Amino acid sequence: MAASLEELRKLQEKDRCVVLQGTVEIGRTHLTRLLDNGWLQEVMKGWYIAARPGTEGDTTVWYTSFWYFIAKYAAVRLGEQWCLTADQSLDLYSGKTTVPVLVIIKSPKGHNNTQKLMYDTSLLVFQSEIPDQVYKEPEYGLNLYPLAEALVYATPRYFQVERIAARTCLAMIRDAADILKVLARNGASLRAGRIAGAFRNIGNSEIADCIVSTMRGFGYDVREEDPFEDQPRTPLVYEVSPYVTRLRLMWENMRDKVVELFPEAPGKIDDVEGYLRSVDEKYSEDAYHSLSIEGYRVSPELIEKVRVGNWKPEEEDKEHKNALVARGYYQAFQAVRGTISDILKGKNAGEAVRADHPVWYMQMWMPFVTVGILQREDLVGYRTGQVYIRGPQHIPLNPKAVRDAMPVLFDLLKNEPHPAVRAVLGHFFFVYIHPYMDGNGRMGRFVLNAMLASGGYNWTVVPVERRKEYMKALEKASV
């Protein structure tokens, strides 16, 4: 077994995600041994992905490997003569991270058969011509339509079903040149009218006018048509990062429902000290439920022990992870309490959380520094590696995207007038982005309560008994 694991380790050093085609890269004995012991899982006959024993039935391994598998399978079967559809290319350009139920690949070598994959996902290789030039996506190695060509050839339905993704991609176009090259080369008057209408919908009349006038100048009968069913509240500006536009559109799309369903805000708190005492009274209950949601085993006695300072990390608690986590939660809770005090005294809630959330995170993990498990530098800044959530189809943003997204989140919080929207969407967006390697759920619930305080709402505990419902709601909003 040790020899087989060594072979797997060599493959993992070479590739970010191990996808194997039969015995091409590993001997049959090693393959069989790794498969029998849970270190590999079969995706389809003759194709395997790396896993860990005990993860059978857990979708995380598959969702983590999904796009790597698609890219390698297509490259082996089709060479470079393939690409995703225009619609699915736009999904990826827009920063949509949800694993789709069906992937459609276009290729002159396509056989028009649907191949079942793991966990109710499927792959269709459709016989079709592909663009003269395809874009090689750097993260997974996928072949995509070039952005401008994908917008031109997207289905009309895409602009209605995937409004956020479509508008995000439109906002990534600086001028009309690349769009016009595609339209002029293929003489697509109907598509020209649709894409011109799409640009006008997001507030970019300059590109819309340029498309219409240029194509008419070439002799095409262009009739502009808006493919969307609604209008964004504010015009979208050119933005290189898709995540900036995507987050703003998601916020706009979700906020009205929060306002509709949430009770009216109590308003400004006059008795600041009284409110803070009520927060203190919630500590034990909040710590128990918040940590239990994350899977830690903490008792009321342990929570009280770390609260009163009867905690000796250098002695009996040094190897007790639950005690370290509980102490960190207490320290972070006190930091959040300080932020709430500033908010109640008049500081803008978004600005307060922007300034203080690194301190919350630092305090959450300082006990691990105290006992030497973590280094101080580990607590500085956002994550630098990819993180995955067990179970959900949603894959958190990549590290570069996190740095694009977090300033947008705090800008949205700063400028959002309704405290309930700040609370609900602030919490959801924080978890959606997942800016840290660990502790995102706890941090998200701290954001929730800091923003609730800004509207005079009471500190709210998410009970562990409703964990499944809570997680399902977060997942539903993410996909």
Regions found by a protein language model. Give the residues of each.
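FIC/Doc superfamily catalytic core
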Residues: 1-29, 35-43, 51, 55-479
